[in-house]
């Protein structure tokens, strides 16, 4: 059921080619079945992004309680550029007061993608219960010896036994953002979002650590079926409130004492389906009551659980130094960030120039601020955990092209 769109949400579209290079493109936005009269047409700037576009959305209050009314408006987005085939995204979600980020890759092949409903409003099969800790025996099975955040997740877009389903290679943080944007609402309290994100990460890292599907003879990490794993929707938009939490906590997971593997933190909506794990709507109520993410997680998984951090993050050349870089900081970590930003600005020319001298001055702070603004992060001008790894991830991607 739809509702009158009498509030406003925001959309930013980012267009790149297959190598991640920004593209000058035209973005047309349509509502409903009207394919002739766009509600907005925007051009991307020098870094392949549109400005924030205001679009009507249902009242935010609809997303704050269970119901049958869809709490977001849906728009169809068509991106086109000279030398590339057009891409059409159907059903991009807009929530009141929230920035929606739609990333589109243009190639020589046209694409038409449909974004299915959020699991809280859509009709998806419930999770088949599993043991939260997988038995690991000396049977010759593949098992990692440390908890690792992989650079890439292989997502099987169907149930495990469906050999016709496509396997997609998705960067880990992008995968978590997609799942969280498909499983919960971005209007919820930050601590609720954090608790749900950490549960999603922990579940996913359990699949990685135990090589669950590979030990069953499959060649993927996880599926997009809610009966087996989480909901992942190819090409879907994400939301700034969720994206920022993932950037900050993407290496965190749920642990129990004396258990090495991340806990398989199963969850359900708590209204249409129930389970022994986290209730998504229940976590929303706890967040409204001021509970922290850890308190929310302990409410569902027990008082002995704690939030752990993965030992290894794959694909990152230099690990976070353990403290925030700011004006007055100096040394090798500052040099690392300066070198990485210097390479990034060759592609993202809106980032101002900076010296590579190992001293965190005003120019470095200005470059960091512009990077944060460009990638929809809180603009602080300082390099915290989230900014360090965001810069590093983009640096690695662009360095491969250099």
Protein language model regions, located:
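Flexible, glycine-rich phosphate/dinucleotide-binding loops
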Residues: 22, 36, 59
